[in-house]
């Protein structure tokens, strides 16, 4: 539905680590919003939000209550934000972690706002899962990863795959539909884990550090340990459970042949091992023959002839940074690029022309050049810049990253 009304809704994530995970993008919206709602867990972030905002702030946690169904709370959280949107305000709501991961009122509010003709969007934040990838040290792509919510896992009797990483969220609120977290049903989750992994398989109880004074929790237990009363007490609403792979999935030789991977897929396996070399207790060799050969070439490396470096005036550097961080400027630019650009001093004619398209291709084209072209004073022609308007590619680096991820 086309947006026709003046109010807007932006949902953002504060990340996990207090203040440190708030992105520059979120900060820019915080400084420009008319009304700010938040549902976060630590007072430092709350103080930061209040100090950096210009609009009225409201704590959504006030709608939680031990005697209320959480579903009722989530509807109320959504509705109070929507009321201000309907009144024509630009509303920002900041939620702990990633605002779209295991969060109900955010998706509800965005869906309703859009259905009523308002502009609504979500800005990402660091989730517990992102934090876990860094702290525990594993790549979800190798050999794959499944993410489940604890209660949903049990209700739908989902089978966990022992050949991939398994992440189970909200293990400290199994079967809870209010705000009473007593771990009474935790044993049902342990039953399920024993069925799929056995009692001696090791798992990690994970809680990412929130406050500057906090310490990250990465406690390792066997699944049978999870039945011990003193262990169960350690699981809270911020707990996540990581279950490492128990076995290696068999290779499908028919597909290997179709992909033209030789033998047992050595080329793919080498890449997979390189991705997973930092995983805990992986046992992988960081400097095998292939890795060492790559290292040996470093001292003799020369950039290819088509390698491009940054070539940008101070004006385009400032403007593109402001465009990324200032929502109001971005809105005005998208409505009428030329009128905004006319007010920016210092842009070269090529830079202004490239920016006038409001397309990424011309900007990439004009802000990079080979060292040889720079030394010779060569500039891209206007036709070359215009010809890149249909390109979304940021160049070889991003293309290479995509190929590596999907190989």
Curated annotation (Swiss-Prot):
InterPro entries per record: 4pyrrol_Mease, 4pyrrol_Methylase_sf, 4pyrrole_Mease_sub1
Modified positions (N-methylthreonine) in chain numbering: 399-400
Methyltransferase domain: annotated span: 1-246
Catalytic machinery residues: 70, 74, 96
Keyword Transferase on entry: yes
Disulfide linkage: none
GO BP of this protein: methylation
Enzyme class per UniProt: transferase
Pathway(s) where this gene product acts: Secondary metabolite biosynthesis
Modified residues (N-methylisoleucine): 401, 404
EC numbers on record: 2.1.1.-
Pfam families associated with the record: TP_methylase (PF00590)
Region (Clasp domain) residue spans: 247-370
Residues recorded with modification N-methylhistidine: 406
Modified residues (N-methylvaline): 402-403, 405
Positions of the UniProt region annotated as Precursor leader: 371-393
Record keywords: Methylation, Methyltransferase, S-adenosyl-L-methionine, Transferase
Domain of life assignment: Eukaryota
Role this protein plays: Fusion protein of the methyltransferase ceuM2 and a type I borosin core peptide; part of the gene cluster that mediates the biosynthesis of a type I borosin, a highly methylated cyclic peptide with potent biological activities. Type I borosins derive from the C-terminus of the fusion protein, and it is the same protein that methylates its own C-terminus using S-adenosyl methionine (SAM). The C-terminus is subsequently cleaved off and macrocyclized by a prolyloligopeptidase to give the final product.
Family per similarity comment: In the N-terminal section; belongs to the precorrin methyltransferase family.
Free-text comment about domains: Within the homodimer, the clasp domain wraps around the adjacent subunit to position the core peptide into the other subunit's active site for iterative intermolecular methylation.
Protein name: Methyltransferase/ribosomally synthesized type I borosin cyclic peptide precursor ceuMA2
Organism from which the protein derives: Cerrena unicolor
């Amino acid at each position: 539905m086309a947006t026709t009304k003046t109010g807007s809704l932006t949902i953002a994530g504060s990340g996990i680590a207090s203040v440190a995970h708030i992105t520059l993008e979120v900060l820019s919206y915080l400084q420009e919003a008319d009304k700010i709602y938040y549902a976060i867990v630590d007072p430092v972030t709350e103080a930061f939000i209040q100090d950096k905002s210009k609009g009225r702030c409201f704590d959504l946690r006030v709608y939680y209550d031990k005697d209320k169904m959480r579903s009722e709370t989530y509807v109320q959280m959504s509705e109070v934000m929507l009321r201000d949107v309907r009144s024509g305000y630009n509303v920002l709501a900041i939620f702990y972690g990633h605002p779209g991961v295991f969060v109900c009122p955010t998706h509800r509010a965005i869906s309703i706002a859009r259905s009523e003709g308002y502009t609504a969007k979500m800005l990402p934040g660091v989730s517990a899962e992102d934090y876990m990838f860094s702290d525990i040290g594993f790549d979800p792509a190798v050999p794959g990863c499944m993410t489940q919510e604890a209660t949903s896992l049990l209700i739908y009797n989902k089978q966990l795959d022992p050949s991939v990483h398994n992440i189970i969220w909200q293990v400290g609120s199994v079967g809870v539909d209010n705000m009473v977290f007593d771990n009474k049903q935790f044993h049902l989750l342990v039953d399920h884990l024993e069925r799929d992994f056995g009692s001696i398989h090791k798992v990690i109880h994970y809680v990412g550090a929130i406050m500057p004074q906090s310490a990250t929790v990465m406690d390792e237990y066997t699944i049978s340990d999870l039945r011990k009363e003193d262990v169960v007490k350690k699981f809270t609403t911020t707990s996540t459970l990581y279950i490492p792979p128990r076995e290696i999935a068999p290779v499908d030789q028919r597909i290997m042949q179709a992909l033209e991977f030789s033998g047992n897929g050595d080329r793919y396996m080498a890449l997979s091992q390189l991705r997973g070399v930092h995983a805990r207790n992986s046992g992988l060799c960081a400097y095998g023959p292939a890795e060492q050969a790559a290292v040996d070439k470093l001292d003799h490396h020369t950039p290819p002839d088509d390698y491009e470096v940054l070539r940008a005036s101070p004006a385009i550097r400032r403007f593109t940074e402001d465009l990324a961080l200032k929502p109001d400027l971005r809105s005005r630019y998208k409505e009428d690029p030329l009128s905004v650009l006319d007010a920016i001093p210092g842009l070269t004619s090529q830079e202004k022309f490239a920016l006038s398209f409001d397309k990424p291709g011309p900007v990439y084209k004009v802000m990079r050049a080979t060292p040889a072209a720079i030394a010779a004073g060569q500039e891209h022609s206007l036709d070359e810049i215009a010809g890149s308007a249909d390109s979304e590619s940021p160049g070889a680096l991003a293309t290479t990253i995509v190929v590596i991820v999907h190989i």
